[in-house]
Amino acid sequence: DNVKKDELILSSRDQIKGKVNFEIKTDSLLQPQIDILFQKMLPILHPEDIVTSFNWKSIQDFKELFSCRYGIILDHEDALFEAKSLSIHDEDMFFMVERTLLDSRNFDLPLNRTVIWTVNEKNDFVHFLDMGAFGVITDIPDTMHIYRK
């Protein structure tokens, strides 16, 4: 009753309709804490959701337990080689790729499993979708929504 009109309090995942991108940040956590975080998250996942993280190890460790899509986040060119190897060995893995990495001569990930962030130019937005990217994320959703096929 004390909730402001523009404030939403979630007590259940069922209150959220549609797809959710759970971007798990683990920078300040120790491995046992990371494991607990991932274990606690498992029961709230829906098949249409996606779990992503810069913590590739945890995504790999828990991928068999996810009831939804999963992926790794890349923001530097050095990560492209290892990500390419993962893309060959794990056909279910998605890749959340920082926009500038698409311009790298080393970019060779499957576009149908690649989500590009952050794209705020309409022409780039449309171009990436036309290229066959799985999705594009923007900081300006009022102008462009998060598109997914």
Spans of features found by a protein language model:
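Metal-dependent phosphodiesterase/phospholipase catalytic core, i.e.
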Residues: 1-77, 90-100
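C-terminal active-site rim and adjoining tail of enzyme catalytic domains
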Residues: 1-8, 12, 71-149
